[in-house]
Amino acid sequence: MSSTVKKTGVKKVVLAYSGGLDTSAIIPWLKETYDDCEIVAFCADVGQGEEELVGLTEKALASGASECHIVDLKEEFVKDYIYPTIATGAIYEGTYLLGTSMARPIIAKAQVEVARKVGADALCHGCTGKGNDQVRFEGCFAALAPDLKVIAPWREWEMRSREDLLAYLAARDIQTSASATKIYSRDANAWHISHEGGELEDPWNEPSKGVWTLTVAPEDAPDEAEYVALSIKHGRVTHVNEQVLSPYNALMKLNDIASKHGVGRIDITENRLVGMKSRGCYETPGGTVMFAGLRAIEELVLDKTSRTWREQVAAQMAHLVYDGRWFTPLCNSLLAASESLAEAVNGDVVIKLYKGQATAVKKRSPNSLYSESFATFGEDDVYDQKHAEGFIRLYSLASRIRAMNSN
């Protein structure tokens, strides 16, 4: 499994560690592959759940790591990555709210910070050679720490299956709770959980009930709708049901409420950055509610050209986040444009949750451009319907000239 002659040049490496099968095998592999190399395990707490972190340090040390750093990034993740991204309206290929993609830059940044702290000369990740994450992580590393060597075991070692990894660990008496019969590959954080693999690899298969773990099936959700009120300031959710909450706590509260109503499920076949298609089932209950609330307030406050520009920013931002280009001048530019528009995105919105749907049913804003008196068909003092005639003649001038030239 490892080279007979060990590689040199790496003395200390920081590994993005989850405690799963892959990264548990990476620790001994690094020690066997690199001469006199110290392994520092790093885990980012981005809201994947306490159960994922219990015993993690002990497991890393038992696998051969010299130390394990668990860094709490939950609040920063929601405040500085999720909130700015959803303010742009970014949604990949019309359906995906970018849960995995948004988490990668903050994890990579924290990994680099740990590497600087411990004096490491290399970074390591457990991403496969077929997925998007290898590009996302290494793109961030290139922007933040181009001097550090990057090690990607899945592109180097001979192991190709879960069975290979299990056999590798067993041969070294390293304990793992993983089994060869794992069905799905899952990735969770505060924003969402993703599910891939198993029967989902055939797009003709409907996802079984065992796929979903965060939300109830819409058909099993309560028969009575629930209403949740959001207050929004500058494109950020500040209150849930009139309660002031931090970004992370607001998201957690909405996750709890919306998941009971089956809100936030999608089943998509997406275009990966590396060129292939993949099928994924995603659950984003609280995020779906937040997204609906922001768009509802935008309908009130953004004029036609501003709305068009916001949609263009959203499309660019969706691809940028998905493709792992967070630490770039383009990202800074798009976020600045979004922040300018978000100055007016203030107000209150009520979202109706019912059997998988999150619908904005009430909305108001101090910056609203909607006026009931202007929009009615009755007489008003601001809009004289006679003025429309001149506007229409100018608006259709090009069509009129074109028709005249063709005669």
UniProtKB/Swiss-Prot annotation:
GO BP of this protein? argininosuccinate metabolic process; L-arginine biosynthetic process; urea cycle
- Whether ATP-binding counts among this entry's keywords is yes
* Reaction catalysis annotation: L-citrulline + L-aspartate + ATP = 2-(N(omega)-L-arginino)succinate + AMP + diphosphate + H(+)
Quote the record's binding site residues for ATP.
Answer: A16, Y17, S18, G19, G20, L21, D22, T23, S24, A44, G126
Q: Where does L-aspartate bind?
A: T128, N132, D133
The main location is cytoplasm
- Localisation: Cytoplasm
- Binding-site positions, L-citrulline: Y96, S101, N132, R136, S185, S194, E270, Y282
A Pfam family cross-referenced in the UniProt record is: Arginosuc_synth
Q: Known EC number(s)? A: 6.3.4.5
Sorted alphabetically, which Gene3D superfamilies does this protein's record hold? Argininosuccinate synthetase, chain A, domain 2 (3.90.1260.10), HUPs (3.40.50.620), Single helix bin (1.20.5.470)
User: How does it associate, per the subunit comment?
Assistant: Homotetramer.
Family indicated by similarity: Belongs to the argininosuccinate synthase family. Type 1 subfamily.
Instruction: List the protein's name.
Output: Argininosuccinate synthase
Q: What taxonomic classification does the UniProt entry list for its organism?
A: Bacteria, Pseudomonadati, Pseudomonadota, Gammaproteobacteria, Alteromonadales
Task: Supply the gene name.
Answer: argG
